Amino acid sequence: MDVMRIRGGTPLKGVVKTQGAKNAALPVMASCLLLKGRTLTLENVPDLHDVSTMLDLLACLGVTMERLGNRMTFSVPEEISWEAPEHLVRKMRASSLALGPLLARCGKTVLPLPGGCSIGSRPIDLHLKGLMQMGAKIEIRNGIVYAQADQLRGRRIYLDFPSVGATENLMMAAALAKGETIIENTAREPEIENLASVLRGMGVTVDTEGTGCVRIKGVEEVQGCRERVIPDRIEASTYVLAGVITGGEVTVDDIVPAHMDALLAKLEEAGVRFHVGSSSVTVFPVRRLMPVSIRAMPYPGFPTDLQPQMVATLTLANGVSLVEESVFQARFLYSEELNRMGANITIKGDTAIIQGVERLQGASVRAMDLRAGAALILAALAAEGETRIDEMVHVWRGYEASDKKLKALGADVALEEAEEK
């Protein structure tokens, strides 16, 4: 279904359970490529378009999968393909996560430059630079990466930016590299620790230290293991904000509250009352938010993947809020769609200036990417009248059964197919 219609103005109320994290599931799925004649079992894998794309990619490389609910078991044969199909890689940026494990396992790989959400410039130069430091020979011709390395070797690598994808790719490559690899200025997101846990289960010595440095001692061959995908902190935070923007009372369950500290700190600053349990957060009705200033940055800072949803929520704050984006370029394109709904957002460079308004109005809008779509859903839930959101296919990449979850909270939501042009 490509279109979501929402009739807003109803305070949401109830409990929503959190899915497994998309951004954790994809790298740990890719890590199965390190195996040889063994299996990897993952629990709590979300049912998402991006997960399906990764499954298709792994299948094309020779991996078989058995699924029971949210449990997946990947069986990897002794021999796998080292050439990734272009039509799948172009669909999803996370396809680049096959690069490190394929190169380490097969000694060579051919991988088209990946696709996914169009959010400014998102190159994989840090991935390639790190692999070359480990001994890989890499060429890019006509948008395709050709990589070769008879034996990757452990090195001390400094990332110029704490890229999540580069950290994950280099961690997987280091698992089969000769000697110790030390990666400095790494990403510190919880999803990194989830991958580290999988690699430890495979018999690799991994020390993440929690300080932006990862040490990995490579092994000749990894073993099969079982691991659970962590809860999705971005999905959980989105539903927390759905409660806030509608003036409702929503409990988000099956979470790790510490992973949401940055959001909760800003909500407290904005005047939101909430209760934090051992594995849940409940937000209570607030008449109107106070304005806040936010800078989206790598973890443990405020997550860039939550920036659009927070901007949508702040459109109804009592005053002027400032939101700066420091991770991705051109991540405010959705603001034009929010302004169509009556928001007052001005973009100056990397900062959104949000003048709060009394109310939003339903309109026809377009989800240009995954998190932009989530932001429009939040705005629609609070708006007067009906909102039509087109190109919902982007949202299905990262949110499992969002229409059903919203309906369970009392939202007036309907899905339909887009009209053929």
Task: Please report, for each region that a protein language model flagged, where it lies by residue.
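Short, structured segments at the rim of ligand-binding sites
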Residues: 1-421
